[in-house]
Curated annotation (Swiss-Prot):
GO cellular component: nucleolus
Known function: Nucleolar protein that acts as a modulator of rRNA synthesis. Plays a central role during organogenesis, including thymus development.
Organism placement in taxonomy: Eukaryota, Metazoa, Chordata, Craniata, Vertebrata
PROSITE patterns: WD_REPEATS_1, WD_REPEATS_2, WD_REPEATS_REGION
Compositional bias (Basic residues): 356-365
Protein's name according to its UniProt entry: WD repeat-containing protein 55
Deletion phenotype: Death between 8 and 10 dpf due to multiple defects in organogenesis. Thymus primordium fails to accumulate lymphoid cells. The head, the eyes, the liver and the gall bladder are smaller. Pharyngeal arches are abnormally shaped and lower jaws are malformed. In contrast, hematopoiesis and development of the gills and the gut, as well as body axis formation, are not disturbed at 7 dpf.
Gene: wdr55
Length: 400
């Protein structure tokens, strides 16, 4: 950008030569406006830009040590992206079309060098993360479409299918050393304890299954719950197990008390399809209603809304390697990023605050109620005023 006219040199306007006995002009010229001369740099955003896909993504996984994500879609394609908060720098790295039918789940190995995917075509694929090339394939790994996938360790893989069969694989041999069917419907999710000894499965038949990897045997099924159990996660340093359901209820089990629930919590959502632990007490859940909720466990409380895919069912959520972002994919064919670093510092007291009069959730991110920063700012200011008014009312009531 050219310098403004007022900063241009004026020496050419002098017509008379200077006198020989005059003092030299030692004054420094005014510096040019640095803002005017410097090129405008790329915009730095709070979160990476949304990624628009060609088809609905069923699954999204994030690299364990880099700003890279992978998603699998209903066409069977797998895509890898490098994401960045610098505008315009989020880009596709590679794509793979080796699955013949819908890709149901993708997962990185712990070292981030391998990627595993399962599909409705009943196959298990291993891909090279750097190039996206197919390394190995297990055709016909299940008799039915595979729905869920878990990496137990660098060599052990667990898969669950639409008919309720669980298989545990030794990937060094490409063979399953556990092949058990104790569910009457699809296996929706799989989790493992920190000792890598006990596998937990949730199913559309409304039960949670418990399997012992070390002894290679089935242990027990929980009592039946109303509706499908859709997700499972360990909380409270492994002392609690939480299961989401198709009816919007979170069921809570004590560790080693898997037969019956110790507690339950109605989230008032259409469903609780995905659960991602953020801290020992706080988890994020995703629902068919398009909302991502932050929930505190014991005391059981919906803290607020992390974000939403407006009116679109969310398929999966996962957090980034540095726990800065939560990433979601939904039926709007978008992958969205949500800032959650402040959520880790959140504490919930036993005191239950008065519910908002209009029933809406508290927004926990600037994008929670939409991408318009102006209106989201107004929402935040309104919520702060409401909280201050509530605190004043509570203090007045305490003083009476």
């Amino acid at each position: 950008m050219a310098a403004p006219p007022e900063h241009a040199a004026t020496g050419s306007e002098q017509t008379d030569p200077p006198e020989t006995n005059s003092e030299p002009d030692l004054s420094q010229p005014e510096p040019a406006d640095s803002d005017a001369d410097e090129p405008v740099g790329p915009k730095i955003r709070e979160t990476p830009e949304d990624i628009r896909l060609e088809a609905i993504a069923n699954t999204v996984a994030l690299h364990p040590s880099r700003d890279v994500l992978v998603c699998g879609d209903v066409d069977g394609d797998v895509y890898a992206y490098a994401y960045s908060c610098t505008e315009g720098e989020t880009r596709e790295l590679w794509s793979s079309g080796h699955h013949l039918k819908s890709c149901r789940q993708v997962r990185f190995s712990a070292d981030g060098l391998k990627l595993y995917s399962v599909s409705r075509d009943k196959a298990v694929h291993q891909l090279d993360v750097e190039r996206g090339q197919l390394v190995s394939r297990i055709r016909g790994a299940h008799a039915a479409a595979i729905n869920s996938l878990l990496l137990v360790d660098e060599n052990i893989l667990a898969t669950g299918d639409d008919r309720g069969t669980l298989k545990v694989w030794d990937m060094r041999k490409g063979e399953a050393f556990m092949d058990l069917k104790h569910h009457d419907d699809y296996i929706s999710d799989i989790a493992v304890d920190q000792a890598k000894r006990i596998l937990l499965t949730t199913s559309g038949d409304g039960t949670m299954g418990v399997f012992n990897i070390k002894r290679r045997r089935f242990e027990l099924l929980s009592e039946f719950q109303s509706g499908d159990l859709t997700s499972v996660a360990l909380m409270k340093r492994g002392k609690k197990v939480v299961c989401g359901s198709s009816e919007g209820t979170v069921y809570i089990f004590n560790w080693n008390g898997f037969g019956a629930t110790s507690d339950r919590f109605a989230v008032k959502a259409e469903s609780v399809d995905c659960i991602v632990p953020i801290t020992d007490s706080i988890m994020c859940t995703a629902s068919m209603d398009g909302y991502i909720r932050a929930i505190n466990l014991l005391p059981n409380r919906v803290i607020g809304c992390i974000g939403q895919h407006v009116g679109e069912p969310i398929e999966e959520i996962n957090k980034s390697w540095d726990s800065r972002f939560l990433v979601s994919c939904a039926h709007d064919q978008l992958i969205k990023f949500w800032e959650i670093s402040n959520l880790q510092k959140t504490t919930v007291s036993d005191y239950r605050k008065r519910k908002k009069k209009d029933g809406r959730m508290k927004s926990l991110t600037k994008k929670a109620l939409g991408d318009n920063d102006f209106f989201s700012g107004l929402v935040e200011e309104t919520e702060k005023k409401e909280e201050e008014e509530e605190e004043e009312e509570d203090s007045d009531s305490d003083s009476d």
